[in-house]
Structure formats: structure tokens, C-alpha cells
Amino acid sequence: MAKVVVTGRDEEDGNRIVKDMTDKGQEAIFVLADVTKKAEIQAVVDKALEAYGQIDILYNGAGIHDAYDNAVELEEDLYDKLMAINVKAPYLASKAVIPHFIKQGRGVIINVGSQATQMAGPGGSAYVTSKHAVLGFTKQLAFDFGSQGIKVNILSPGFIETPMTDGIDDERLNRIPAKRAGKPEEIAALAVFLASDDSNYMHGSNVFMDGGWVLGRK
């Protein structure tokens, strides 16, 4: 069974997630951190090593959306915030754990993308740019470190039933070939596969779970 370190800036939410896991007999801790700050990311890594002795899997799941603004309408502050959370945070976390993976001779990094890794439209200028950047970063990590036993892939969900996608109307869902939003459990199952030995020959892959959204809109 996995031992999990949950991190983020929302202490209440983080503790809720950990309690939900521990109530089910799983082992987990929460470490409060701003994932855009190098020192705080390093503190999370240190805490994980102190608690569990090693790190095997890094899941870079932090992310925010924009207001579907084009480049002219987009405020610079929002652009900077998106780039910090969606792009800089995965870089900082990966930079912190990869030396440990190299020493172990193995490790897994799963970055979170979206349909916006492949197409325009699922967000505005900042969001689409950020997710294209995450895709490029994932590919380069896989290229640079795959020979050292480090597997890096990107999981790209579509509309999933989460607070981030609340308020999606039926008209938009009906344009998805599957005609529904995805479930968190479906994303979790895919993440487990990408973390497992069953996907060991996958390096730098962009794996979609989006109900067919990137195939085209009906």
C-alpha cells in the first residue's frame, strides 16, 4: 500500500484528504507548502524522506484555470500566477526529487495536463500556454532521465467531476463524444497504472482521459 504525502496551501483541505485516507486504513501525512516556492518544496521532500525513508512517485497535480481570456484581455498578474502554479511548480518539485530517484535507480513522475496540451480552446491564452509548457517539460524530462530508470508521463484529463469544473452545462457535456464528465475514480485508476510497472515502457507519453474531447466537438 502506498504511503502518501499530500501538500498544498490549503491546510483544511489537505488535512481533510489525509483524514479520508487514514480512515480507510491508508498511511498519509499533510505538509503545508506553497508549491511555487523552492524552499517550501524542498521542505516537503525532506519531510517525506524523514517520514518514509524514500520517494518513489511524484504526482504534480496542482493547477489553476484562467477566465478564457485572450492575450489582449489577459491580465499580467493572472498570467504570472498561472505560470507559477501550472509550470514552475512541477519544475521545482521534479528538480527536488530527481536526485533521489537517480540514487535509487528508479522513480516515477506524473504531470497533469489537460486537453489544452493538444488544442486551443479548453482555456484562455494563459492556461493553454501553461499546459503546452507542461507537455514539453514532461517530454524533456523523459528524454533526459529515462535512461536512469526514471519514468515521466503526462496525464491529461478532460472535464472531471471536481470543484474546478463545477457549473459545466449540459450543452457543453453533450459536445463530448462520451456525453458526460469523467469521475475522479477514473483518473485515479489511470494514475495508478502510470505509476505501476505495467507502464514501464511508456516514457514521455501524453495520456488522455477526456471522453473523446480532443477528437473533435459534436
Can you name each region flagged by the protein language model?
Residues S94, S130, T138:
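Active-site helix of classical SDR
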Residues S114:
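Residue(s) in the substrate-gating loop at a strand-loop-helix junction
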Residues D69-A71, E75-K81, R172:
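Substrate-binding pocket helix/loop in short-chain dehydrogenase/reductase
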Residues G53, G146, K151, M202-G204:
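Short, small/polar-rich loop/turn modules that mediate ligand/substrate recognition or access, typified
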